[in-house]
UniProtKB/Swiss-Prot annotation:
Keywords: Acetylation, DNA-directed RNA polymerase, Magnesium, Metal-binding, Nucleotidyltransferase, Transcription, Transferase, Zinc. Its EC number is 2.7.7.6. Its cofactor is Mg(2+); Zn(2+). This is DNA-directed RNA polymerase subunit beta'. Belongs to the RNA polymerase beta' chain family. The modification N6-acetyllysine is found at K972. Zn(2+) 2 binds at C814, C888, C895, C898. It comes from the Bacteria. PANTHER family: DNA-DIRECTED RNA POLYMERASE, DNA-DIRECTED RNA POLYMERASE SUBUNIT BETA. It comes from Escherichia coli O1:K1 / APEC. Mg(2+) binds at D460, D462, D464.
Length: 1407
């Protein structure tokens, strides 16, 4: 019994470990793993099905085929355990050792490991400092390499061809040593003295100045140091012993009909063994050199194919022309070991079925079909049956359940009570895609789902399926109940707003019951309370919409949080009074005393949650749903063709538009406008007409005229069903109604350009053939887009999760005073996002002062909740500095104060929360949503008429920033700068509106002038970009040669002619290098200088520019010299948006980025070269000037002599985030990325909290490049984890030494994921081979800090409920205790023993 216990203990023991190290395996190490050498290529005997001895499946090496039974059958049963049979040499033990015992093959000639050879950069090549081509020629026996030059003139590592080798032999005899093949490379690697080489390289590094050389040297130094420190020996990159995978991991399965299905690895191993044995035989026979050489090359190729098939040369294919799967393919890719088996596994105890509506369920319930429940809860039922004594054995219990006896259903009811199940809908895009519910048993076969959780699951009932999982252990049930229950997930983690929001029918019902109607039955009554209102409605004495007075009792919370009653008479309607009956105490009556649309209902739930907390909100949400469904049914709202009222004005509007189009067409034919301008204008006309039709239609639908009690006519909001559905937010939008009853509008072609003839018909009138045909474009594009975008969005989410997965809240407060300034987002005349929305739930980084005083309004380190935000609004604060994860000082994680509020829970975030994953999901989930939604409007082009003026909305004074302007002949200002901003300032000095003013705009009011609301302050032509002269004089053409750089277009009708500049592609060879330009000269023909500079005024013209002046014309400043047609706008939707988000997170450089000033100083222009100008910035303090060559075609925003600050825009274009980081710092780049990403999502109406984007930015900024190493042991130019540098510098400064200086790096999310400290995480993401090769050479240790690594090694993750376990392990390790081994009690032992004996007796159950 005692040794049996020991045996059991050995099985249950789990290894405790803190880190995983990867390294190269030495030949001795491979031999130590092995249980014997595989000598023959045979697998199994096809007649007896027994494995061949010494073959690939040999039982003597790898273990017995059957449990506790040797191959020849001499020893069977458990009692002979551990005996080695003297006849067949097999150890009697369990079969599962065939999954863990390895073998080996002794290679007759060394072979190079292809990963270290071909995985770029080639490690062997880098170590030997030889080109890969040369090494390959040596390895594959094409040339010789000199290993020892001796006294000859041959260098070590010199490559010799066959002839050169023979010549050298004749000349020097055996003075020198040269070889070919892997043994040569092995000899070279063996003879390297790494430490000496390292010293030598460091000396070289200090002497050299060339950038490329330095890079190469540092690379080599890093590799050599890695070898020295990790204890790897270079020659181990050449294999002399090949390990053989355990046979059960490369199985051979007999199919019916005597054929076998086998793993590709067996074929690959067979080739290696065959070639190896042949080579041994040839060597024994002392065969001619050329034959041996050929065999060695073939062996090298066979080993290559086994390790990584297809990496070099053509992939080896099997019988069916498909490349064989090598060892490398087994671990990489979606089907590889990491992603298929380690990161996600299939689970037991799960089922799936179609979902249907469960409108009578409570929020925490789901309907589970009895059949499913019976199957899922089987183990619990068996246990209960035995416990009750209703069944004697498990087998008997099994029988009872199979017969479905009556008692089984009773037991099932008991088992299921209070036992939550998890429901999951694929794709699980965010954590709300898996929630826990209590099951309610139902008949039928479909799962019933509560309608309010559909939004979180993004589920609908058109055939969606969901999976059910059963949490088995007590801990799992507890977590499901406490954390995952649907009632605990009312707020969305992405934006902190309720996600349990009624939609569709419920909204329509509530909207219908809270609408009021003129002269409804029972109008003017005074009622004693909601109860009476309901009685009157039920008995038919009053209409739901009747305007009445009702006595209402409200409850308000006082200072102590006690509820105080307050009764008053309210003007309201019957329906609202009835709805008041379900509103929980503590909410004001105003909340229901309005027509409730979807937004109002959401706000109502939000208020309820903030004031009353979780439980009342859940009950309220359920009540809202029941009520909504009931009254939606009563409303009888339905859609009939007569509900689509076509406005009378439609015909008139369309004929006006057609007239305008005809006029433009005429102008085009008479040459007044170009084709491009005509197209743009036509589209604008139709876009405007469309807006007018839809406005007329909405006005028409919106109101109806009724007779009131006094017999007068009165307008009231319409009860048209379609209008009610759209107005309440239940279904449909103005854009969709426009297509039903207005006009379908402009359509887009598949390439995104807009077709200029719109569809003037609507769906009610019906489309003709042409219109229908045009419509198919958009509809088809929508569907095609959807398929593509879903994949792209999923991939974006995967990259985001990967980069942020190890970010967890690890401490309460890091104590930093850093933070980012938050200001409201103002676009045009609207505040797109007020300050309160941006700072809500953040922590202040410094005291917020009352504007204009020194009084502290909000102290530092305050979590800004709703009440604080109200205070900020009352005092009109317009900038607050808040803590941010980007500036958090915690190493390996962030602190709770820098993160702020946990959006899904409404209080400050807890330690151990995996904020990285939440952030990634919050950004990734809407990406997919939006892309799936593109086709709902059916591809109708949604393009606003182009902006052509600025009209302010409020009164105030104008403030212009970064402006340059000239006064034109009529005394107006013309803007000549490119990023001018016009702000409207109110009397308190707050910015109310902000606009971008384009180049060439004419201003009606100047800087500092007062304007009235509704006044137009600037206008411009939206379709062409002018070239404006800043000086007066005469025009002189340069390089404008007809037929070479320009063509003259004369209009037949008007005889007006204009010059069009040719694109360089269209020019003749002679015109390629010419630069057409307009020069301004004075009457004497001398150059006129641009004011304030000593540059002549000449304006280079880009291709397609149109000039309507003649040579020598007189002009005055502010006049237009030429017009450049702008490309017409395409349609805007997230199709452009998703790639934009991906570009931002990948930190890609835009094609032609803006050029920013590298230093502050005065601008001047140096000597020009052919196509470039030389820009020189001279600092004011007299240090070295900075020079940069800029292509001439770039339009510059600066003039000679102008003063620029570091980071100012010199030439327009999209800004590259790397430049912003380098020149303006971390906060600027954070602001840039956050705002740009938010712009894309805001366009789609998706709310995401800024925090989430900041979390990702923090991860993108986690590397730093060492500029100067100081006393640290970093290398200059080395890229290191930012936290590492911080820690090292802290230690150095504590010892009074000089820290390293560094610059922060911005990495794209893919790069950042691959550059993590953890090689396991990186390998399971992408480029598995490269990551593992690099890690093995460097002998990396993975500290298992992140979530992914811990999932892969099969542990609890260091976040959430697993956080405590990890903290505990760290504490124990620090205290130096050994972690307690699992205790085995006698009961456990006997139970395990019984199980083993059963297995032994059954013998057949060994699956």
């Amino acid at each position: 019994m005692k040794d049996l216990l020991k045996f059991l203990k050995a099985q249950t023991k789990t290894e405790e470990f803190d880190a995983i190290k990867i390294a190269l395996a030495s030949p001795d190490m491979i031999r130590s793993w092995s249980f014997g050498e595989v000598k023959k290529p045979e697998t199994i005997n096809y007649r007896t099905f027994k494995p061949e001895r010494d073959g690939l499946f040999c039982a003597r090496i790898f273990g017995p085929v059957k449990d506790y039974e040797c191959l020849c059958g001499k020893y069977k049963r458990l009692k002979h355990r551990g005996v080695i049979c003297e006849k067949c040499g097999v150890e009697v033990t369990q079969t599962k050792v065939r999954r863990e015992r390895m073998g080996h093959i002794e290679l007759a000639s060394p072979t190079a490991h292809i990963w270290f050879l071909k995985s770029l950069p080639s490690r062997i090549g880098l170590l030997l400092d030889m080109p890969l081509r040369d090494i390959e020629r040596v390895l594959y026996f094409e040339s010789y390499v000199v290993i020892e030059g001796g006294m000859t003139n041959l260098e070590r590592q010199q490559i010799l061809t066959e002839e050169q080798y023979l010549d050298a032999l004749e000349e020097f005899g055996d003075e020198f040593d040269a070889k070919m093949g892997a043994e040569a490379i092995q000899a070279l690697l063996k003879s390297m003295d790494l430490e000496q080489e390292c010293e030598q390289l460091r000396e070289e590094l200090n002497e050299t100045n060339s950038e490329t050389k330095r890079k190469k040297l540092t690379k080599r130094i890093k590799l050599l140091e890695a070898f020295v420190q990790s204890g790897n020996k270079p020659e181990w990159m050449i294999l002399t012993v090949l390990p053989v995978l355990p046979p059960d991991l490369r199985p051979l399965v007999p199919l019916d009909g005597g054929r076998f299905a086998t793993s590709d690895l067996n074929d690959l191993y067979r080739r290696v063994i065959n070639r190896n044995n042949r080579l041994k035989r040839l060597l024994d026979l002392a065969a001619p050199d050329i034959i041996v050489r050929n065999e060695k090359r073939m062996l090298q190729e066979a080993v290559d194919a086994l390790l990584d098939n297809g990496r070099r040369g053509r992939a080896i294919t099997g019988s069916n022309k498909r490349p064989l799967k090598s060892l490398a393919d087994m671990i990489k890719g979606k089907q590889g070991r990491f992603r298929q088996n380690l990161l996600g596994k299939r689970v037991d105890y799960s089922g799936r079925s179609v979902i249907t509506v469960g409108p009578y369920l409570r929020l925490h319930q789901c309907g589970l079909p009895k059949k499913m429940a019976l199957e899922l809860f089987k183990p619990f039922i068996y246990g209960k049956l035995e416990l009750r004594g209703l069944a004697t054995t498990i087998k008997a219990a099994k029988k009872m359940v199979e017969r479905e006896e009556a008692v089984v259903w009773d037991i099932l009811d008991e088992v299921i009570r209070e036992h939550p199940v998890l429901l999951n809908r694929a794709p699980t895009l965010h954590r709300l895609g898996i929630q826990a519910f209590e099951p309610v048993l139902i008949e039928g076969k479909a799962i019933q789902l509560h309608p309010l959780v559909c939004a979180a699951y993004n589920a609908d009932f058109d055939g969606d399926q969901m999976a059910v999982h059963v949490p088995l252990t007590l801990e799992a049930q507890l977590e499901a109940r406490a954390l995952m229950m649907s009632t605990n997930n009312i707020l969305s983690p992405a934006n902190g707003e309720p996600i349990i929001v009624p939609s569709q029918d419920v909204v329509l019902g509530l909207y219908y019951m809270t609408r009021d109607c003129v002269n409804a039955k029972g109008e003017g009554m005074v009622l004693t309370g909601p109860k009476e209102a309901e009685r009157l409605y039920r008995s038919g004495l009053a209409s739901l919409h009747a305007r009445v007075k009702v006595r209402i009792t409200e409850y308000e919370k006082d200072a102590n949080g006690e509820l105080v009653a307050k009764t008053s008479l309210k003007d309201t309607t019957v329906g609202r009074a009835i709805l008041w009956m379900i509103v929980p105490k503590g909410l004001p009556y105003t909340i229901v005393n309005q027509a409730l649309g979807k937004k109002a209902i959401s706000k109502m739930l939000n208020t309820c949650y903030r004031i009353l907390g979780l439980k009342p909100t859940v009950i309220f949400a359920d009540q809202i749903m029941y009520t909504g469904f009931a009254y939606a049914a009563r409303s009888g709202a339905s859609v009939g063709i007569d509900d689509m009222v076509i406005p009378e004005k439609k015909h008139e509007i369309i004929s006006e538009a057609e007239a305008e189009v005809a006029e433009i067409q005429e102008q085009f034919q008479s040459g007044l406008v170009t084709a491009g301008e005509r197209y743009n204008k036509v589209i604008d006309i139709w876009a405007a007409a469309n807006d007018r039709v839809s406005k007329a239609m909405m006005d028409n639908l919106q109101t109806e005229t009724v007779i009131n009690r006094d017999g007068q006519e009165e307008k009231q909001v319409s009860f048209n069903s379609i209008y009610m559905m759209a107005d309440s937010g239940a279904r449909g939008s103005a854009a969709q109604i426009r297509q039903l009853a207005g006009m379908r509008g402009l359509m887009a072609k598949p390439d995104g350009s807009i077709i200029e003839t719109p569809i003037t018909a609507n769906f009610r009138e019906g489309l003709n053939v042409l219109q229908y045909f045009i419509s198919t474009h958009g509809a088809r594009k929508g569907l095609a887009d959807t398929a593509l975008k879903t994949a792209n969005s999923g991939y974006l989410t995967r990259r985001l999760v990967d980069v942020a997965q190890d970010l967890v809240v690890t401490e309460d407060d890091c104590g930093t005073h850093e933070g980012i300034m938050m200001t409201p987002v103002i676009e045009g005349g609207d505040v797109k996002e007020p300050l309160r929305d941006r700072v809500l739930g953040r922590v202040t980084a410094e005291d917020v002062l009352k504007p204009g005083t020194a009084d502290i309004l909000v102290p530092r380190n305050t979590l800004l909740h709703e009440q604080w935000c109200d205070l900020l609004e009352e005092n009109s604060v317009d900038a607050v500095k808040v803590r941010s994860v980007v500036s958090c000082d915690t190493d390996f994680g962030v602190c709770a104060h820098c993160y702020g509020r946990d959006l899904a829970r409404g209080h400050i975030i807890n330690k151990g929360e995996a904020i990285g994953v939440i952030a990634a999901q919050s950004i990734g989930e809407p990406g997919t949503q939006l892309t799936m939604r593109t086709f709902h409007i059916g591809g109708a082009a949604s393009r606003a008429a182009a902006e052509s003026s600025i009209q302010v909305k409020n009164k105030g004074s104008i403030k212009l920033s970064n402006v340059k302007s000239v006064v034109n002949s009529s005394g107006k200002l013309v803007i000549t700068s490119r990023n001018t901003e016009l702000k409207l300032i109110d009397e308190f000095g707050r910015t109310k509106e902000s606009y971008k003013v384009p180049y060439g705009a004419v201003l009606a009011k100047g800087d500092g002038e007062q304007v009235a609301g509704g006044e137009t302050v600037a206008n411009w032509d939206p379709h062409t970009m002018p070239v404006i002269t800043e000086v007066s004089g005469f025009v002189r053409f340069t390089d404008m040669i007809d037929g070479q750089t320009i063509t003259r277009q004369t209009d037949e009708l008007t005889g007006l002619s204009s010059l069009v500049v040719l694109d360089s592609a269209e020019r003749t060879a002679g015109g390629k290098d010419l630069r057409p330009a307009l020069k301004i000269v004075d009457a004497q023909g001398n150059d006129v200088l641009i004011p304030g500079t000593d540059m002549p005024a000449q304006y280079f013209l880009p291709g397609k520019a149109i000039v309507q002046l003649e040579d020598g014309v007189q002009i005055s400043s502010g006049d237009t010299l030429a017009r450049i047609p702008q490309e017409s706008g395409g349609t805007k939707d997230i199709t452009g948006g998703l790639p934009r988000v991906a570009d931002l997170f990948e930190a890609r450089r835009p094609k032609e980025p803006a050029i920013l000033a590298e230093i502050s100083g005065i601008v001047s222009f140096g000597k020009e070269t052919k196509g470039k100008r030389r820009l020189v910035i001279t600092p004011v303090d007299g240090s070295d000037p900075y020079e940069e060559m800029i292509p001439k075609w770039r339009q510059l925003n600066v003039f000679e002599g102008e003063r620029v600050e570091r980071g100012d825009v010199i030439s327009d274009g999209p800004e590259a985030p790397h430049d912003i980081l380098r020149l303006r710092g971390v906060h600027a780049v954070t602001r840039y990325i956050v705002n740009e990403v938010q712009d894309v999502y805001r366009l789609q109406g998706v709310k995401i909290n800024d925090k989430h984007i900041e979390v990702i930015v923090r991860q993108m900024l986690r590397k730093a490049t060492i500029v100067n190493a100081g006393s640290s042991d970093f290398l200059e130019g080395e890229q290191v984890e930012y936290s590492r540098v911080k820690i090292a510098n802290r230690e150095l400064e504590a010892n009074g030494k000089v820290g390293a200086t560094y610059s922060r790096d911005l990495l794209g999310i893919t790069k950042a994921s691959l550059a993590t400290e953890s090689f396991i995480s990186a390998a399971s993401f992408q480029e598995t081979t490269r990551v593992l090769t690099e890690a093995a050479v460097a002998g990396k240790r993975d500290e298992l800090r992140g979530l992914k690594e811990n999932v892969i090694v099969g542990r609890l993750i260091p976040a959430g409920t697993g956080y405590a376990y990890h903290q505990d392990r760290m504490r124990r390790r620090a205290a130096g205790e050994a972690p307690a081994a699992p205790q085995v009690t006698a009961e456990d032992a006997s139970a395990s023993l019984a199980e083993l004996l059963n297995a032994g007796l059954g013998g057949s159950d060994n699956e």
